[in-house]
């Protein structure tokens, strides 16, 4: 019941030494967010008010993002570009109330790589068990395709996640962090680009890097390419690799504006 309002963040030591690095990175990300977003860097928004839980999830989240950034950096042509790739990793920002989360999303919505939110947290000064659902629903109305993940200790909240087209993670699950990494890898544009058949969702192609995309862009099935283009998946995949100029360019070449799949193939090829 102590008043902790004088502190920027309060953490709970759970024995994971990675927490120390996470604290440093979290403060760095908050301080650099305004500047880096101007250069195209993306934001991962974490909404969680439980000190114990965000002290546990942040080390896992940072470890995963940093590992992915190191892998992407190896695709760079020289040491300078490798450093730029590392610096361009997504920034992780923590919000602990509805108002704080909505303010961050509203300001940086065009640079939001994805949102991970609890279901129960403060709204208008009071704990609200539906705050997460209302937040994710509001974000979904703003952006039809931004990846959303709802996490809760109440398994029945999975129905609410489905209503706002978000993935659901059970906080009580022993494999919670395995599920979290799986969803982030699949939804946020990390890892290989897996092209899928929109009807069966079966894998039709797997591309590991930019060269693979350029080499195979004219061979990808029309329906699969259209599915991913219409959901900004290509742009998101490039963003996660800190390829901001290409990503920003392709983000504005939408299917609704062009409606020519062969022209899209050529534009992607030329942009790379």
Residue spans for each PLM region:
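A short, hydrophobic beta-strand element within the central beta-sheet of small alpha/beta folds
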Residues: 1, 8-12, 48, 115-117, ...
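Acidic, metal-coordinating helix/loop segments flanking the phosphotransfer/catalytic sites
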Residues: 72-114, 124
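Short acidic-hydrophobic, aromatic-tinged amphipathic segments that line or gate anion-handling sites
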Residues: 9-15, 93-96, 168-172
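Acidic catalytic/metal-coordinating carboxylates
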Residues: 97, 125-134
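Terminal, compositionally biased segments used for targeting/anchoring and flexible tails
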Residues: 156-272
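Short acidic, S/G/P-rich loop/turn micro-motifs used as interaction or catalytic elements
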Residues: 17, 50-54, 99-100, 119-126, ...
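Conserved acidic segment of CheY-like receiver
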Residues: 40-52, 57-82, 92-94
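Receiver (REC) domain switch/output surface
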Residues: 4-9, 13-33, 60, 163, ...
